[in-house]
């Protein structure tokens, strides 16, 4: 069976990492009593599940499609000897919806949201006598305060609502890093000056350390800069001796190496990539790298018959993109779901444009207070995907038209637009696709399902 063992974060890879996908212990806890009865310290659970596939899917080995309000996972882990002295980071790419993670029965941390990755430094919770992880996820898509996308809020699928996804549905993995290391980066291209600006997040231990950033194209160095880490988040601009543009159908990518040096003996090396391209919207249309382009996009909902939210293999992600391109499309609107990073990685390589959306359905957008349930995860999504050249635009909401006599909250729409623009002004923003005009929007789109081309 394919447990999806490829690296889940190809834009930032360290040498020392380990997939935790595979067979885990599993138990449904609809009464949600396990948290009070010490399930996090149990030596086993009642069933087995194939991670990263959700328990509703056939590939999980469970195939339970009724509502599951609480689910538990457990597995033993082994820390390689060569990781000794490093920080051990535990990563979850996505788990729906409210998740608590325990290591050896002790709480490592929690996360709210079903679509974005989260991580914990578990170094201090590890033991020399063996280690195990326990995960508890609560999920209830039937209310109006939780984003759920097109997961059905009824027992069965109906209309354009499909089988639900509960708990872990993307990869779980560990990596070892030095205390001083890079956490994430975003990129911004300046074609006129032939340079790229990285906005880099560092750990606190990185302050005062040296960082060397090296760009390569086809294995040849085309730029390098060395500086001192003076802030947890800082910008680094790197001039390039060769300018190769990322284009539709030709995803030209540079390799990038970040080396954080803390003293003479300790250095953390992480490798990634970036693309050079600029997007712009003018009165006469959309422009990529200064040339007017027509976006012919497919609506991709990212559901799979056997894996539901989770692609059965990495090859399936590539096949989806290549099929779309073979039909004459040059991009996709990733609809009501946050796709896994490897989809964007393949879109980057193939020159396939993407509008990044989230699964806002399920959230009552007439209530401005729901910003607390939406905005934190939306910011996490933007920060996750800002390094991908294939992502040319953001779409936080879809079709939030009047419902039961309630109007969408313009205060909510305006706040989300302003927040998105403040984080990333380099991409297009369609605040609300196919709905009423918003108080702030880069462009307004219409969903027209007329089948007669005349």
What are these regions (language model features)?
Residues 127-130, 201-280:
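Extended acidic/polar, glycine-enriched regions
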């Amino acid at each position: 069976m394919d447990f999806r063992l490829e690296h889940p974060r190809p834009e930032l890879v360290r040498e020392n990492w380990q997939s935790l996908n595979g067979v885990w212990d599993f138990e449904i806890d609809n009464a949600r009593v396990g948290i009070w009865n010490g399930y996090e310290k149990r030596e086993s659970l009642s069933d087995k599940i194939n991670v990263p596939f959700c328990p509703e899917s056939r590939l999980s080995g469970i195939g339970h499609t009724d509502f599951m309000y609480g689910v538990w996972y457990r597995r033993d882990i082994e820390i390689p000897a060569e990781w000794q002295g490093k920080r051990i980071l535990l990563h979850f790419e996505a788990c729906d919806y409210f998740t608590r993670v325990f290591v050896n029965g002790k709480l490592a941390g929690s996360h709210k949201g079903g679509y974005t990755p989260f991580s914990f430094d578990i170094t201090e919770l590890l033991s020399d006598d063996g280690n195990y992880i326990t995960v508890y996820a609560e999920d209830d898509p039937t209310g109006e305060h939780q984003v759920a996308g097109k997961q059905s809020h009824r027992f069965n699928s109906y209309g354009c609502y499909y089988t639900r996804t509960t708990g872990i549905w993307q990869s779980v993995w560990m990596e070892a890093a030095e205390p001083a290391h890079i956490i994430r980066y975003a990129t911004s291209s300046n074609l006129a000056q032939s340079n790229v600006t990285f906005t880099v997040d560092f750990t606190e231990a990185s302050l005062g350390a040296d960082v060397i950033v090296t760009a390569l194209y086809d294995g040849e160095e085309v730029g390098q800069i060395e500086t001192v880490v003076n802030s947890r988040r800082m910008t680094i601009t790197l001039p390039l001796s060769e300018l190769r543009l990322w284009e539709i159908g030709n995803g030209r990518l540079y390799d990038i190496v970040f080396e954080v040096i803390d003293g003479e003996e300790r250095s953390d090396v992480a490798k990634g990539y970036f693309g050079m391209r600029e997007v712009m919207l003018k009165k006469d249309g959309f422009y990529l790298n200064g040339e007017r382009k027509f976006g012919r996009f497919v609506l991709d909902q990212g559901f799979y018959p056997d894996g539901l939210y989770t692609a059965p293999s990495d090859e399936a992600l590539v096949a989806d993109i290549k099929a779309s391109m073979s039909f004459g499309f040059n991009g996709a609107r990733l609809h009501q779901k946050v796709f896994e990073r490897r989809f964007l990685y393949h879109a980057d390589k193939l020159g396939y444009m993407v509008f990044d959306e989230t699964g806002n359905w399920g959230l009552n957008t007439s209530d401005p207070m729901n910003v607390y349930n939406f905005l934190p995860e939306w910011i996490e999504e933007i920060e996750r995907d800002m390094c991908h050249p294939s992502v040319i635009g953001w779409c936080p909401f879809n079709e939030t038209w009047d419902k039961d006599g309630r109007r969408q909250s313009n205060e909510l729409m305006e706040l989300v637009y302003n927040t998105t623009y403040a984080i990333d002004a380099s991409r297009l923003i369609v605040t609300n696709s196919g709905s009423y005009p918003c108080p702030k929007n880069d462009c307004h789109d219409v969903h027209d399902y007329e089948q007669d081309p005349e």
